[in-house]
Amino acid sequence: MGKLVLYFSEFRNTESIARRIAEKTGADICKIEPVEPYPENLQEVMEIGQNETDNEIMRPIKQLEVDLSKYDKVILGMPTWWYHAPPCVESFLKNAALEKITVFVTNSGIPLNVDDEMKRISPDTYVESSEIIEFTPLVEPSRLVTPLEEIDAWIETL
């Protein structure tokens, strides 16, 4: 059994943290990807993403390239989309039947209550721990706000 960092990242903020966690813990890493990719234009993604989130539209995802049963620890990374988990992550969680999970959430000023969101999406999944990692808004070149030392200290607990 081992660790898996599983993440969804449209603009690479979440991906950068996922890669850091995998590198520092020796975990495997896998990306959650939509069947139909989002456009590359930020404004278009924001419009589509907000519509999906507001209307609770589940975006179909590609089959994962890993077998979740081989891992005793799954670390899920996601950005905040309009105070919620992105539709791709909701699609994953509603079908994954995980007993427990560790969650990290990146945001650019829009917070997410991880416990409430996980109870809403996957009420039978126990959240072992969670971490909120903040970046500057995406409308400018996005930069990490949460100190790396704080992130690394959390990673050491994994």
PLM feature segments, named:
Residues 1-76, 83-85, 128, 149-158:
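N-terminal beta1-alpha1-beta2 submodule of the flavodoxin-like/Rossmannoid cofactor-binding fold
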Residues 11, 36, 81-83, 108-111, ...:
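Solvent-exposed loop/turn segments at secondary-structure junctions
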Residues 15-18, 86-89, 115, 141-144:
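Conserved strand-to-helix beginnings and helix N-cap segments that scaffold or border functional pockets
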Residues 19, 23, 91-94, 120:
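Short, well-ordered alpha-helices that flank and scaffold nucleotide-derived cofactor binding pockets
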Residues 59-65, 88-94, 115:
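A generic local structural motif
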Residues 68, 93-100, 122-125:
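Short, conserved loop/helix-junction motifs that constitute active-site signature segments
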Residues 79-95, 100-103:
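Mid-chain, well-packed structural core segment of small domains
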Residues 102-146:
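Short, glycine-/small-residue-rich phosphate/pyrophosphate-handling segment
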